[in-house]
Every structure is written in structure tokens, then in C-alpha cells.
Amino acid sequence: MARHPRWTLSQVTELFEKPLLELLFEAQQIHRQHFDPQQVQVSTLLSIKTGACPEDCKYCPQSSRYKTGLEAERLMEVEQVLDSARKAKNAGSTRFCMGAAWKNPHERDMPYLEQIVQGVKAMGLETCMTLGMLNESQAQRLANAGLDYYNHNLDTSPEFYGNIITTRTYQERLDTLEKVREAGIKVCSGGIVGLGETVTDRAGLLLQLANLPTPPESVPINMLVKVKGTPLADNDDVDAFDFIRTIAVARIMMPTSYVRLSAGREQMNEQTQAMCFMAGANSIFYGCKLLTTPNPAEDKDLQLFRKLGLNPQQTRVLAGDNEQQQRLEQTLMTPDTDDYYNAAAL
């Protein structure tokens, strides 16, 4: 059963056509019904395996098909990941997201992934991963390890999708979201503005997300970061008001979801970001880099928070800074079965 009434494309189109200030007012009212408007959830994103991805996503510098100057890197060592998580927590993040440039993880990678989830969770941080497509077994193993969120974006509308990606179908993305949900992991899924899509495509993306059996708990809205060497490097800039409008419509359609102001913040001024928060955005990525693209420095974000009277949201998780953390960190690098496989060692 759907948690909310199903939306139609005509209803979503009507929202996009509303006068902007009226739309912002409606979005802010809905936002205040479900969230503290002064609280912003703060996440940090780390690339645990960079580049050499076999996919052909036209926006992505990590694709092996494009010459962007990005050098491929092997999987990070477990302790490197945990050290980055500690730094993220000390900087104020409450959720640590880990991404790998894969079409999908291999079975041999699963023990490594399970261990870093357990290690990060033991620090009292929420955990999130984006690893490509998952099968049922992989989703359940990550759930059993304690993974809180799994990110798998739809990127755009079903109609425009084939113009951007051909190596993975839209239905495969939806199937992964279903497997994640069935495993008991919270869903993080959103899209990108600036791919060359129309307003109808933006409406179609949000329609897909909002009409999932349960809408995503987290909805990242990205502004395209144009990277030289990718097919979309010369795309037109996104109008700030169009981006703000997309945030507002997402908030109205998914009132209880966290709407994340995601990639592209480095190219937004403070006024644009402030209007995004007014439109209902209540989550950001914090730190100087999102996988391989720039993000505002931590001190700039703190200054903006002070100017706007915003505060990082505090999150409690079941595992915290206690003896469990010490025990896990002592055993993380010690194989306990003959089948132990350390993906980082390859």
C-alpha cells in the first residue's frame, strides 16, 4: 500500500507551473508540519573505490569510457575508511556515505563491505552505501551488517533516461530499490537537474520517486557538475530558480522525506542555497569533495548555517562510541574464517 495518494503527471506539472513564491510558501508550510525548519541533516560522502566504472552515464567522470583526467584508484583499506569516518564525525557529520564506482559489487567484495559498515556503525554514525545494482542476497547481507541507507538514484524520468545511460535500464534501478526496501534498508534515491531534460522530465522523475510503494526516506537533488571530457561538459547552466522550484516540488510531493541539497552546491551562491532551504531542503553533504567533484569547504557551510540560524541535526544510532567500537576495530583486519577475502588487498 502506498503511504501517500498516488500523484499524476498533470498534478506535478501544475506544481511546477505555480508562481515561485506561492510554491515556496506551500513547500515551507509542509516542511514545518514534519520537520524542525532550523535543523539540517549532515552527511559526508567518501569514494572507497574511484574510477574505471564500466557504465556509460554521460555526466560521470568515473566512467572508463570518457577521458576526464581522473585516475582510477583501488579499494581503500578498511582502516583508511574508518579513519575518514572518524574525521567526518569530528567535523559534525551524523551519516557516513560510502560509494564505489561499480556496476554492481562482486560476491568476493561482500565481507569487506560488511566489515566497514560494522566499523562505521560502531562509531555512532548512520551508514549509507552506493555500490550500483544489488541482488537480494547482497542487500540482505548489508542489512544484516547494519547498513542504514542505500543510495541508488533514478537520475531522470523514464522517458529521458535512455539519452543519458544505456548500460543499465531504468527497471534495473527500480528493481534494486525494491530489493533494498525488502531487506529492511532505508532508501536514498533522487536525480540530477541539468542533464538537458525538460521540466516535464523533472516532473516525471519526482513522480517516479513519490509513487514508489514507500517514497525514499532521503531524496538527493543534484545540480549537474559539468566535467571536461564527459558528453555533458558543455550543457547549459541550470537556472537557480528552476533548481529551487524542483526542491520545492520534491518537498510538497514527499513531505516526510529528507530532501538533500546534493552535488552542485559549490557553484551555488549563498542566496540560492538559502532559498533551497526555504523550499524544504533539509540535508546536505558536508566536506570538500563529493566522490570526485568539488563541494563547499566545511567552514563555508558553518558560516552559512550561522547566517541562516540553522543547526546540524543530531542523530542517535543503536551502536555508539563504547566497547563495541573498540572490539570491532581490534577484529576488523583479522580473518575469522578460511573464506575471508580482503577486497582492499587486490
From Swiss-Prot:
Pathway: Cofactor biosynthesis; biotin biosynthesis; biotin from 7,8-diaminononanoate: step 2/2
EC number: 2.8.1.6
Positions of [2Fe-2S] cluster binding: C97, C128, C188, R260
Annotated Radical SAM core domain residues: 38-256
Cofactor(s) recorded in Swiss-Prot or TrEMBL: [4Fe-4S] cluster; [2Fe-2S] cluster
Entry-linked SMART domains: BATS (SM00876), Elp3 (SM00729)
Cofactor note: Binds 1 [4Fe-4S] cluster. The cluster is coordinated with 3 cysteines and an exchangeable S-adenosyl-L-methionine.
CDD domains: Radical_SAM
Residue pairs linked by disulfide bridges in the UniProt entry: none
Domain of life: Bacteria
One Gene Ontology biological process: biotin biosynthetic process
Entry GO MF terms: 2 iron, 2 sulfur cluster binding; 4 iron, 4 sulfur cluster binding; biotin synthase activity; iron ion binding
Catalytic reactions on record: (4R,5S)-dethiobiotin + (sulfur carrier)-SH + 2 reduced [2Fe-2S]-[ferredoxin] + 2 S-adenosyl-L-methionine = (sulfur carrier)-H + biotin + 2 5'-deoxyadenosine + 2 L-methionine + 2 oxidized [2Fe-2S]-[ferredoxin]
SUPFAM superfamilies: Radical SAM enzymes
Keywords from the named record: 2Fe-2S, 4Fe-4S, Biotin biosynthesis, Iron, Iron-sulfur, Metal-binding, S-adenosyl-L-methionine, Transferase
Enzyme class: transferase
UniProt binding sites for [4Fe-4S] cluster: C53, C57, C60
Pfam families: BATS, Radical_SAM
UniProt cross-references to InterPro entries, sorted A to Z: Aldolase_TIM, BATS_dom, Biotin_synth/BioAB, Biotin_synthase, Elp3/MiaA/NifB-like_rSAM, rSAM
Function: Catalyzes the conversion of dethiobiotin (DTB) to biotin by the insertion of a sulfur atom into dethiobiotin via a radical-based mechanism.
Entry similarity comment: Belongs to the radical SAM superfamily. Biotin synthase family.
Assembly: Homodimer.
UniProt name for this protein: Biotin synthase
GN (gene name): bioB
